[in-house]
Every structure is written in C-alpha cells, then in structure tokens.
Amino acid sequence: MKMHKRLSQIAVALTVVSLAGTAAAANIVGAQSAGSGASTITVGESQVPFGPHTAGKAGVGISSYAAGIKVDFQGLTPSSAATELHPGTDKGMTVYQLHDPITTGTPGDPNNPAHAGLGSFNFVKVGTGDVWFGEWSTNGNTGSPTYQNRQVYYVGDKTGYTAATGTAVGYTLTGLHRYGANTHLTGSLTANFSSRTFHGDLSIGATQIRLGTSGSQIAFDTNGHFDAANAGQWVIPGNFVLKTGDVKGDFFGAQAATVAGIVDFGDQSMNIAWGGTKN
C-alpha cells in the first residue's frame, strides 16, 4: 500500500514536470560541481507539490531516485538537524544536515518521511530568501572512504533582484567543505557595484580560499551572475597556491542582499560551497 501510494505520488510529480513547459517558469538559478558516481545531484526549480514540498522553489534532484525529480530545500528542513553557524555575526546562517541512515523520519507523518538511500546532505539557508548552498555525498562522514562522490552546489530564486549601490559593499561569508569532519569556513567579500566586480576570501585553520586571484577581481553581470574560470585559489601556508578553480554564483534579493556560489577545483575532495549576507 505504501509503495502504491509512493508510485502514485511520483506519477503526479511526473505529470507536473510534463506540464511545466505550459506554465511560467520560476526564476531559479544555480550550479553544481560534476558528479563521479552512479548517483549524482542536480539543482534547479523544484517540481514536487505534495507532502512537505512545494513546486517552483529552489530545489535538488538525485539521478537515481524518481527520475531525478527535484524537491525544494525548504521542504527538507523539517527532516533535518539544524545548527546556527556563529550566531550574531552572519545574520542567521543555518546549516541543515539530512543524512542516510541517520535521518529516519517520523512513521506515519507525510511531512517528515524517511530519507533512506538518498545520501548525505549538508545545506545552508542564506538570509531570509529562497537561497541555499551545500554539499552532497553518498555517505557523508561515515564509512571508508568518507564523502564518496561528493558534489557542491548553490541554488536560489532571482525574483526581485536589484543591484546594491556603492563601491565597497561588504558581505560576511560562510563556506562548507566536508562539514562534519571539518567545521565551516568563514570569510568576507567586498563588491563594487559601479564596476560590477568583487573579491573575497574564506578560511579554515591555515587554509585560505581566495575568490579572485591575488590582486585581481571577479566580474559579474547586470543580473548579478558570475562565472569566472580559474578565479579561485586554494592557498596553503607560505602563500603557496595549491590549486586554482572556477568561481560560479549569483547575488540575490533586493539591493543584492545575499550572495551564494561554489568554487569548483575539479576535485571532489577540495570543492567549496559558500554564501553570505550583506553587512
């Protein structure tokens, strides 16, 4: 009976997907690093309208589950363990952990189902809008090796975006890199909305992640989007650049209230997801 109900729900979701082309598309943007396993994730507009989930929001799908249909991140939060990151300094950054098999759900509660077989999610809500970043792997900080097939991502709703004003607009940043085995990264970003450029950095211990190579800036377009090849650096003590990576992301909200992105080093063990709120 439960399987029949689940199959019926999936059928409804597939119908929603097939009808999506006839409806106005939500303004959801995002990106993820490449996957390497049998299962991979893709971020984008959510398509599931039942249970705890809502269609048309920032979401994620797993290729090996229900044909990769995307569910919204907000709908995953009731089933997740929540931790506020350095409260009082980053305007409400909260990391949610949804882990298989740790997150068992509540039997009989359609708004808190079990998530067995869906892998391990660490994801962060940025500010008050529908903006998220995080990491996914098949096993998280368990097993050997840990964090298998790891991917990082960001996704959010661009509706209502307007540029900020000023040549030195500051943001407080948070980043994730194998959260659970490590703590979160912290940092800052300064954006010039006249020249549409920014630079920033994140750090954890003695490791620094530069957003913009030493002495250079990353450009963003009139819609607050950026995609800069080899513009990120993984820097270790001695100012040695261990690796460079692509920096992708977006500013979101009125007056560019938030920002989120990834640094894709082409190495699942090094890739970073990050985001922040305007100071």
Question: PLM ranges: what are they?
Answer:
Residues 1-26:
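Gram-negative bacterial Sec-dependent N-terminal signal peptides
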Residues 25-279:
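Mature soluble binding/inhibitory domains
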